From Swiss-Prot:
This is Aspartate 1-decarboxylase. Binds 1 pyruvoyl group covalently per subunit. Is synthesized initially as an inactive proenzyme, which is activated by self-cleavage at a specific serine bond to produce a beta-subunit with a hydroxyl group at its C-terminus and an alpha-subunit with a pyruvoyl group at its N-terminus. Pathway: Cofactor biosynthesis; (R)-pantothenate biosynthesis; beta-alanine from L-aspartate: step 1/1.
Length: 155
């Protein structure tokens, strides 16, 4: 068995840190649902600013809030405004790599979903386990402003 990425929130911005709350990370359930992260699931959190690496479990905050709040002892590792990578994992047999397709979400500084990606492993002529990233269409209800709306309004 090998440990693999199962789902990832990449570059989400910390919106709060609550030292006095019991441990966990509070996340917007809409982000978690899209990525496939479940409540009470253990996740690894990597702080892009400080390099801190911690592990805790997920609880859901308010839907649509775009929250990312470190609670309890985890609150000591991040500050509001820090960007973090939140990664869930699972153990699979090596041959099951071909059947996995982890969902990876990237974020804007305001925690809107920027990109929806899938990681894939396929056998190629180069190697038995080759890595690919697929870009998926963004959800219709995404609040991401890529500037195209402003361009249309001016034209």
């Amino acid at each position: 068995m090998i440990r693999i990425v199962r789902a990832e929130l990449h570059g989400i911005t910390v919106t709060g840190a609550d030292l006095d709350y019991h441990g966990s990370i509070t996340l917007d359930p809409e982000h978690c649902d899209l990525a496939g992260i479940r409540p009470l699931e253990f996740v690894d959190i990597w702080n892009k600013q400080s390099g801190a690496r911690i592990s805790t479990y997920v609880i859901f905050g308010e839907a649509g809030s775009k929250c990312c709040i470190l609670n309890g002892a985890a609150a000591r590792t991040c500050q509001r405004g820090d960007q973090v990578i939140i990664c869930s994992s699972s153990y699979v047999e090596e041959t099951a790599l071909y059947d996995t397709a982890p969902m990876v979400l990237t974020f804007t500084p305001k925690n809107d979903v920027k990109d929806v990606l899938r990681y894939r492993v396929k056998e190629t002529a180069r190697r038995p386990f080759d890595f690919f990233i697929e870009t998926l269409p963004r959800a219709e209800n995404s609040d991401v402003d890529d500037g195209s709306a402003a361009d249309r309004a001016i034209a």
